[in-house]
């Protein structure tokens, strides 16, 4: 394992056998410290042109230190692969600066003071988005915004609070991406049903990962919202591990109904665990490649009402 102190004055531990790191301490532990918190210059060229710790892309089976410069990585993939920029929005920054428990407490204890901190975080994210697009020099195909604003049953906090303090800044980020011709995929695990219409209102081009374990179903969402928004994900990783091959084929072909007319990228609904045998992983990928061609031929799994 490894312990890392981040630029957000927090410490996380990465156990190599566990997919995600665990935050163990935060220096910003009072609302007064949050109000005094200073974000590092989002336009600092070192973010894009210098090697160093990448505390998002560096996380994998281990934790990579001193990763290549961001722009070098972009150039190594472009144009052979679609290359998306990425940015955390305020909710994800709260996880990294104060932790989700403090965030939820402060919404109740200090709603306006905490709300101003959220707004400052999104102002930082907006400027970092602009700087990233400029540094890429036209080499990006789109943008992913990391939010993670929900759990299995609902969003973490009142949708009205989110609309007041989080949504305006998020929309500004989306607008800047669109001004540069970059479609936006918004990432939030959990059940975000209560704000799906807000996603559409903000101009989110697609939602990821449509967590099946949070009672989201891509076919139902396509019924409800049509092609106002795209979808990425929804293959339940628990089913992927537990179901037999016939069951997997039924699941995959049924979900591919959401691809009618475009707008669906088939993906896992969360991080792929090591409980999925490589043979099953490969089987699902081959199914998508075979049956995900247009015109779709889904046989007995074709749904007439889509």
Residue spans for each PLM region:
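Active-site loop segments of alpha/beta catalytic cores
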Residues: 5, 18, 28-306
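N-terminal accessory beta-strand-rich subdomains and adjacent acidic, glycine-rich linkers
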Residues: 1-29
């Amino acid at each position: 394992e490894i312990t890392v102190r981040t630029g957000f004055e927090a410490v996380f531990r990465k156990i190599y056998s566990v997919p995600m790191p665990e935050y163990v301490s935060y220096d910003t532990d009072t609302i007064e410290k949050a109000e005094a918190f200073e974000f590092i210059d989002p336009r600092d060229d070192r973010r894009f042109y210098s090697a160093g710790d990448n505390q998002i892309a560096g996380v994998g089976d281990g934790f990579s230190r001193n990763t290549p410069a961001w722009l070098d990585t972009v150039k190594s993939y472009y144009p052979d692969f679609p290359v998306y920029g990425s940015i955390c929005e305020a909710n994800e920054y709260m996880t990294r600066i104060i932790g989700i428990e403090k965030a939820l407490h402060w919404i109740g204890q200090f709603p306006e003071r905490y709300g101003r901190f959220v707004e400052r975080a999104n102002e930082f994210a907006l400027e970092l988005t602009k700087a990233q697009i400029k540094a890429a020099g036209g080499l990006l195909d789109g943008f992913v915004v990391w939010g993670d604003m929900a759990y299995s049953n609902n969003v973490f906090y009142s949708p009205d609070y989110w609309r007041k303090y989080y949504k305006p800044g998020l929309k500004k980020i989306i607008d800047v991406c669109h001004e540069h011709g970059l479609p936006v995929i918004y990432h939030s695990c959990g059940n975000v049903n209560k704000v799906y219409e807000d996603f559409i209102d903000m101009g989110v081009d697609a939602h990821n990962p449509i967590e099946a374990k949070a009672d989201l179903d891509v076919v139902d969402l396509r019924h409800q919202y049509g092609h106002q928004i795209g979808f990425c994900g929804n293959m339940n990783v628990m089913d992927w591990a537990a179901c037999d091959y016939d069951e997997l084929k039924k699941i995959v072909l049924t979900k591919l109904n959401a691809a009618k007319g475009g707008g669906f990228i088939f993906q896992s609904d969360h991080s792929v665990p090591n409980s999925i045998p490589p043979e099953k992983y490969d089987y699902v990928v081959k199914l998508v490649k075979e049956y995900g061609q247009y015109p779709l031929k889904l046989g007995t799994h074709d749904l007439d009402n889509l």
